[in-house]
Amino acid sequence: MYVDILLLAELTSGPKYGYEIKKNIQNRLGENFELNHNMLYPSLRRFENMGAITKKVHTQVGKPNRNMYDITETGEEIFSEMLREFPEKLATNNIEFLVRIALFEKLDYEERKEVLTIRQDILHKQLTAIQSLDANSFFITEVIDFSKSRIEHELLWITSLMKKI
């Protein structure tokens, strides 16, 4: 779902070519937010079929045609709904969470707080589960300690974000 959110978010700032959408996302968020052609173009076609975006074909002499995509009012509504929707299943996914944080400017205070609270609850559950594990070897203990540390660090970050929203 994060690919759809990023794609529509990119179009909220104006019409763009597919390649431009891909490059802008990677330039802003880095390579951790994978968006390859096999993800981008099927999503663009699906959104076009839904009426969420429009496509204008720009003919080029001696070159392949280029498609310019723009978001519609329906697309804006779909984008807002997708961004706000953050069920527990999605909240366990790091990228889904980080994409929503990156787009916090598009959410109001209550929506931001809800995203952070849902993720915080998930992390507390994960921490409880990890703490109950039986570490029967040195390396398992290392993995458990690393996982606890990562979760605790993210919980501190969420606490910090709560003060900034």
Regions of interest found by a model, annotated:
Residues M1-L90:
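Basic helix-turn-helix/winged-helix DNA-binding cores
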Residues I165:
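Inter-helical turn/loop segments and adjacent helix faces that build the functional surface
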Residues L98, I130-N136:
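A surface-exposed regulatory interaction patch that couples sensing to output
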Residues M39, N67, F139-K148:
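Alpha-helical scaffold segments that form or flank carboxylate-/histidine-based iron centers
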Residues K113, Q120, H124-L127, D134, ...:
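Heptad-repeat amphipathic alpha-helical coiled-coil interaction surface used
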Residues S80-K125:
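Amphipathic alpha-helical dimerization/coiled-coil segments
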